[in-house]
Amino acid sequence: MPQLSGGGGGGDPELCATDEMIPFKDEGDPQKEKIFAEISHPEEEGDLADIKSSLVNESEIIPASNGHEVVRQAPSSQEPYHDKAREHPDEGKHPDGGLYNKGPSYSSYSGYIMMPNMNSDPYMSNGSLSPPIPRTSNKVPVVQPSHAVHPLTPLITYSDEHFSPGSHPSHIPSDVNSKQGMSRHPPAPEIPTFYPLSPGGVGQITPPIGWQGQPVYPITGGFRQPYPSSLSGDTSMSRFSHHMIPGPPGPHTTGIPHPAIVTPQVKQEHPHTDSDLMHVKPQHEQRKEQEPKRPHIKKPLNAFMLYMKEMRANVVAECTLKESAAINQILGRRWHALSREEQAKYYELARKERQLHMQLYPGWSARDNYGKKKKRKREKLQESTSGTGPRMTAAYI
């Protein structure tokens, strides 16, 4: 358990609680001693605003191991500072609340920034990296670098596994440049060529300009669904537009043809099915034409029909009625009002009409007309059933 500098009591746990925050006083740093001297005598140095601005400037300059102030210090002052940083790693936190210090620290990879969970960070709202944001204090502007982040780095947050940092390139030193006083940031570690993506996030990928030259990898391996890879590839690739699919023209590596190749076949099938439906109707019409048409033979008129035929014009002239039902009722009343002798005349005319009809159509029977109606109904039913059969099959093909 760390002890207070100058405090007595050795390692006695009764002097302080285990959860108490213990401040440490840095020794041997002239810059910090100057700050503590200014804090202890505020009335001599000026108002409170100048002290706060100097504190902000010092807190932003001192933790940066590669800044201008560290280079200007002597080597003897740098060594105890680094030793102190190894002993107390909490003092080197970034003043913005530890944006880049949430993950585990790797001492051998000082040039890299570890970002294990980007979605839980309050600074990253959508889980994506933001461009370098210039932060301006009262006097010194400080720029937060993005450290050459790969454009597909936001996709890493979908997987729970953290990528190990790559090996440090030997030809690029990560130490401080003595001429400019700025650190050389090594390039980011190589991103693996395969990312496990979620199905909902595939359609939101916008590839950069330099992604066109890279090889295309199948996306179906990252999905963990029970259905086969061909179906998942079809659903995922359908969300890409034509200009977003990289690589040379030709069939995809997943075995799915380009949408421009698939759609013409479907368009060619539809006219074929329509032509089949058009050919169904002429076949029924040709069958009707081939059958010999029998003329509809009317049955011979009886006595009442002959009377109606003769007296209809007189009733229409006498009455203003134009409805046939009302005219037929009037003619029926008048027919029943006739005497037997008057009706006998019309019965004789009806008998002659039947004889003439038998001479003209010797084998005719009244059943032929009624049988034709039944035949027509049967043909209509057969046409409707046979017509819907091919139509339904053509629709499902």
From Swiss-Prot:
Question: What does the UniProt record report as the effect of altering residue 20 to A in this chain?
Answer: Prevents nuclear translocation of CTNNB1
Tell me the impact of changing residue 19 to A.
Answer: Strongly diminishes CTNNB1 binding and transactivation. Prevents nuclear translocation of CTNNB1
Q: Cytoplasm as a keyword?
A: no
Explain the post-translational modification: Phosphorylated at Thr-153 and/or Ser-164 by NLK. Phosphorylation by NLK at these sites represses LEF1-mediated transcriptional activation of target genes of the canonical Wnt signaling pathway.
**The UniProt record lists the keyword rRNA processing:** no
- What keywords appear on the UniProt entry? Activator, DNA-binding, Isopeptide bond, Nucleus, Phosphoprotein, Transcription, Transcription regulation, Ubl conjugation, Wnt signaling pathway
Residue ranges of the annotated DNA-binding region, renumbered to this chain = 297-365
Compartments (UniProt record)? Nucleus
Question: Where on the chain is Phosphoserine found, per UniProt?
Answer: 130, 164
As for what it does, the entry says:
Transcription factor that binds DNA in a sequence-specific manner. Participates in the Wnt signaling pathway. Activates transcription of target genes in the presence of CTNNB1 and EP300. PIASG antagonizes both Wnt-dependent and Wnt-independent activation by LEF1. TLE1, TLE2, TLE3 and TLE4 repress transactivation mediated by LEF1 and CTNNB1. Regulates T-cell receptor alpha enhancer function. Required for IL17A expressing gamma-delta T-cell maturation and development, via binding to regulator loci of BLK to modulate expression.
Q: Which family is annotated?
A: Belongs to the TCF/LEF family.
| Protein's name according to its UniProt entry | Lymphoid enhancer-binding factor 1
What species was this sequence derived from? Mus musculus (Mouse)
